[in-house]
Amino acid sequence: MSKTLSEEPYNKSHNCKGAVRRKGRKIIAKKFREADAILIGASNGLSITEGLHLFADNAAFERLFGDFKRKYGLGCILQGMMAGWPSEEEKWAFWARLIHHYCGQYQPTPVMNNLKAIVGEKDYFVVTSNGEGHFELCGFDPTKIYEIEGNWFTMQCARPCHDTIYPSLEVAEKLSAAEQSGHVPTELVPRCPKCGGPMDIHMGADQRMIPDTAAHARFQNFLKTYHGKKLVVLELGIGWRNQLIKAPMMRLVASEPNATYVTLNLGEIYITDNIKEKSFGLDGRLDELLPALREACEA
């Protein structure tokens, strides 16, 4: 028989009454306060909450990329990120505009400020498939962030002829300022300092993306440090099909006797049966759930 959060940790919060949800938040807050460390997993649900929707042909996409949409038939930001561009001048015009808008002009949002407040002074680590770099821009320590699919702040040789990654934010800002009619000047197009070939933003899941071995090593060291200790795994905006973050996180919780799993997502809560006794699931908008959790943690 299924039970509510007042009876056992596992909960699909949309099936619970308000009083039970409030009690659930208090239980979760207690877990945060008692935790030795917090492991944050984040995917596109967090980006969407902040106003960045890679998959949507929405008003924001029309405002930023309406000209690209009509010229190239792009249906969303992700299609532009994966496009085979006719020229490097056009490719970098797209990326410069994207990075300038979502990174160069970015200001920390309430959802990220609430997340920082929940973490407080505890040790933490962030594992994310989001490439826009908002964790770092909001003041999270970049040495405690593992962006498993790369990020927009760095670029690499497109071949690649070597495994060095280079900063791209300042370059993108210069390109954005120089862009005219969907093109950037040829002389400003980034070139590989080794082979002279084209450069790509350091992101993606194919074999050409240079892996961030240093960040991966730091993540493994974090897990080693808190093995057997009270670790809260906080998952933000990740659907059940996610094999890059969600599946490994649940396996980690299953292997750690003192770990607690907290998943926040809109419209879909998935927790495997083998960890449900030490898991919490809250169904709702992150910009509503995180302030409520922050309030519970500070009570």
What positions do the PLM features span?
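Conserved catalytic alpha/beta core of Sir2/sirtuin-type deacylases, generalized to analogous enzyme cores
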Residues: 1-299
